Structure formats: C-alpha cells, structure tokens
Amino acid sequence: MSSSTQPAQTSPSPSKITLSADSQLNGFEWWRRSLQYQTGLGLTPSEKAQYEYDYFHRNLDQKCDTCNDHLKWVLAYSPSVRFMMDHIQKLNKSNEPVPRNKIVCQTCDFTKGGGFDPNHGIVLCSNYIRSKWQLEDILAHELVHVYDYMKFNVNMLDLRQHACTEIRASMLSGECRVWNEMKKTGMGNFGKKFQECIRRRAVLSVEANPVCKSREEAEKAVDVVWKSCFNDTRPFERVYR
C-alpha cells in the first residue's frame, strides 16, 4: 500500500499523555525505546511523543540529584563557568560571588534547559538536562545573561536588548559549537552553522517574550542588533568554545 493511502498518524495531545508503566521506564525496555528514539527506526509519532514525555518525567528525584552533582563539578572545574563567575563578581559592588543558593536545580514544566530571573537567580531544569556538558553550556548561557544584566542593565521587555543578550549568550556559551550543529543538522552549509544556530536560538527566545507579537517582530529585533552584538564577546577576548 502506498504511503498516500495510509491513514495519517498523529501525536497525542500533551495533556492526554501520562507516564508509562514502570516496566517501560527501566532496564532493557527503556534501552530499546531509547535506541529506537535515537535512530527513528519504526518510531511512530505517538511513540515519539510518549518517549519524550516519559524521558522528561521519569526518575525526577534522581535527575535532580544528578543535576546537583554535575553543578558542583562544573562550578569547580569548568573554565568558562569559572571565568564568567569571576567577571560577574567584579561587577558586584560588594565584590561578592554569585550566591550558590541562587543557582538551583529543579524540575521544570517548560521545555528548555534553564532560565535567569534577576529577582530569583538561575534555574537549571534537571528533567531536561541530559549530561554534565549540556549543563555546562546552559549555565554558561545564563551567566552571560547575569553579566549583561549587571553591566548593561538589560531590560528584557525591550526586544532589541533581549535579542542582544540572547545572541551573546548563545555565542559565548558553547551551545552553538559547530560539532553540536553537525550532529543535529548534518554537514550541509557547514560554514554558516555557528551563526545560523545563534540566530535561530535568539529568534525563538525573543518570540517567547510576552511583549513580542510575532515571529516576524522577533526576527526584526535580532536582525537590527545582530552585527554589534555578534561582535561583542565581552568579557571574553574572543569566542573560544
């Protein structure tokens, strides 16, 4: 039967998905499902949606403990994180470091790795962080936001200012390194992968801003500040990750 005559398979609504049975979440069966998800072989849209829900909602206490362990290591040994922490401390009038209790791991109900709020600090979403190295990138990203907020008094409700700090955070954190993009998008357009990743992430973040009315408005904000913000590597001398 040709694919054009097969009934379309649709993913279930996220509100209708519940956590799978324990037998599906551990051991060989979880390994099998993970392999199928990574390869895409025989994976239906509903199975994909179920796996993603299960991944982000299973073993939450264990993931939070792992996140805290990774955070301790990154704060102690990551060159980029320690560099950012040092420069943020220099901006602090009291010359005090970022309080450890202002960087927390917790379960999140939004689909991103972390966030920064000037009144509360940095949140690392333990149920969305897959590795120590991903946590390092996410924390470095959020620390760029902290630095920009302290040095430039960034107003996140100004879309151009928001776009600028997002461009800088994705550029300096390492999350857009070419190898990461090659794994996601292949070898095509190799020379532009770094910039395309930064632009894509910045547009998505600005589009999610409550004062942004459309994707087009987000793209315009990013375009307007792109050249100046992409070339601003402070406090680094250059992009090295």
UniProtKB/Swiss-Prot annotation:
The kind of enzyme this is, by top-level EC class, is: hydrolase
The protein's matches in Pfam families, at most eight in alphabetical order, are given as: Peptidase_M76 (PF09768)
User: Record's Gene Ontology CC terms?
Assistant: mitochondrial inner membrane
Q: State the organism named in the record.
A: Lodderomyces elongisporus (strain ATCC 11503 / CBS 2605 / JCM 1781 / NBRC 1676 / NRRL YB-4239) (Yeast)
Could you list this entry's UniProt keywords, alphabetically sorted. Answer: Hydrolase, Membrane, Metal-binding, Metalloprotease, Mitochondrion, Mitochondrion inner membrane, Protease
Q: What is this protein called?
A: Mitochondrial inner membrane protease ATP23
Task: Please give the biological process terms from Gene Ontology that the record holds.
Answer: mitochondrial protein processing; mitochondrial proton-transporting ATP synthase complex assembly
Active site residues of this protein: 142
- Broad class of the protein's primary localization: mitochondrion
Molecular function per GO? metal ion binding; metalloendopeptidase activity
List the EC numbers from the record: 3.4.24.-
The protein's topology relative to the membrane is:
Peripheral membrane protein
Compartments (UniProt record)? Mitochondrion inner membrane
Q: Does the keyword Mitochondrion apply?
A: yes
Keyword Mitochondrion, does the record have it?
yes
Ligand binding (a divalent metal cation): 141, 145
